[in-house]
C-alpha cells in the first residue's frame, strides 16, 4: 500500500517529533536552543481565522505533553480578516482557567489601527481579559515613519490591560527602540522576543538587527522581556529555539527573561 505524505501528515510528524524531543530534554538545562521555560504567552487557535484549526483544549493537551505549566491564548482581534468577533473575547471570561492540568490565561492579540494607538477591541472587552498583546499588522495598520509607529505603540500601551508588545521587530514598521523600552518600563509592558519572527521561514524580514536593538535597550534599562512561539496551531507551542539563540548571542541576562517562572509573569500582570 502506498502512503502519500500530505502536508497535514508532515505537520503531524513534526509535531510528534518535537513533543518527544522536548519530553526527552525536560530534565536538562536549556543549553541547545530549546529552553524548557514554564509558559508560552502567545498562541493562536482556530478563532484567529488562519493558520490552524486547533482548539484551546488541543493546545492544553499539547502543552501538557511537552511539560509546560501555563499557556496564553491570544487570538487576533476582530479587525483581522476571519478572526473571532467581539463576542468571542467577551465570553472568554467564562472559560475554564485550567485544562488538562495546564493553567490557561485568556488574552488577545489586539490590532493597533492608527498612530493614536486605537485598538480593535473595546475597553469593556479588554477588561475581562487576563492581558493583551498589541501588534501592528497589515492591512489593519498602515506602516508609518519611525516616529509615528513609536507614537502608536506608546499610546496603545497606556491601557492597563496591555502587557506585551508583539513582534515589534517587524522591518515594515520601524521603531525607536530606546524610546519604546523607556515607555514600556514606565507603563509595565513587556517587549516580546518572537520565535516566529526569527525562524528561517519568518515573513517579517531580517529582524535580527531589530531584535538585537530590543535586547540592548532592555538590558540597558534593566527591563525584562518575554519569549513567545506565536504558534498558530500545535507544532510550535513552547518552541523558543530562535528566540533563545538571540538571547544567548546578545548576552542578555536570563534573569530578565520572565518565561522562567509563571508566578513572576502572573505577578507582572497585576502591575500597572
Question: Which residues fall in each region the model found?
Answer:
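Histidine-centered catalytic micro-motifs
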Residues: 38-49, 165-169, 229
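Short, positively charged and aromatic/hydrophobic N-terminal segments
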Residues: 13, 21-27, 32
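Short acidic/histidine-rich active-site segments
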Residues: 223-237
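Active-site mouth loops of central-metabolism enzymes
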Residues: 43-54, 138-144
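Histidine/acidic-residue-rich catalytic or RNA/ligand-binding cores of hydrolases
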Residues: 49-53, 83, 174-181, 201-215, ...
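His/Asp/Glu-enriched short active-site or ligand-binding loop at hydrolase and phosphoryl-transfer sites
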Residues: 190-203
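Extended substrate/RNA-proximal surfaces in nucleic-acid metabolism proteins
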Residues: 64, 77-193, 248-257, 264-272
Amino acid at each position: 500500500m502506498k502512503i502519500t505524505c500530505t502536508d497535514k501528515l508532515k505537520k503531524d510528524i513534526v509535531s510528534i517529533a518535537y513533543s518527544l524531543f522536548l519530553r526527552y530534554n525536560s530534565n536538562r538545562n536549556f543549553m541547545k536552543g530549546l529552553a524548557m521555560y514554564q509558559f508560552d504567552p502567545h498562541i493562536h487557535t482556530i478563532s484567529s481565522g488562519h493558520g490552524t484549526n486547533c482548539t484551546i483544549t488541543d493546545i492544553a493537551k499539547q502543552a501538557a505533553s511537552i511539560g509546560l505549566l501555563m499557556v496564553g491564548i491570544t487570538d487576533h482581534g476582530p479587525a483581522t480578516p476571519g478572526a473571532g468577533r467581539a463576542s468571542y473575547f467577551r465570553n472568554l471570561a467564562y472559560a475554564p482557567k485550567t485544562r488538562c492540568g495546564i493553567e490557561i490565561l485568556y488574552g488577545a492579540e489586539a490590532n493597533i489601527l492608527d498612530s493614536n494607538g486605537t485598538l480593535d477591541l473595546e475597553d469593556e472587552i479588554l477588561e475581562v481579559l487576563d492581558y493583551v498583546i498589541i501588534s501592528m499588522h497589515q492591512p489593519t495598520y498602515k506602516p508609518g515613519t519611525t516616529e509615528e509607529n513609536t507614537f502608536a505603540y506608546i499610546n496603545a500601551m497606556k491601557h492597563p490591560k496591555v502587557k506585551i508588545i508583539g513582534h515589534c521587530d517587524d522591518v515594515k514598521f520601524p521603531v525607536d527602540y530606546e524610546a519604546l523600552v523607556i515607555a514600556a518600563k514606565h507603563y509595565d509592558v513587556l517587549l516580546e522576543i518572537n520565535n516566529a519572527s526569527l525562524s528561517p521561514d519568518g515573513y517579517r524580514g531580517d529582524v535580527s538587527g531589530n531584535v538585537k536593538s530590543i535586547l540592548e535597550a532592555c538590558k540597558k534599562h534593566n527591563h525584562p522581556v518575554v519569549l513567545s512561539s506565536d504558534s498558530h496551531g500545535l507544532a510550535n507551542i513552547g518552541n523558543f529555539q530562535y528566540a533563545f539563540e538571540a538571547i544567548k548571542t546578545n548576552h542578555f541576562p536570563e534573569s530578565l527573561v520572565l518565561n522562567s517562572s509563571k508566578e513572576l509573569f502572573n505577578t507582572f500582570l497585576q502591575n500597572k
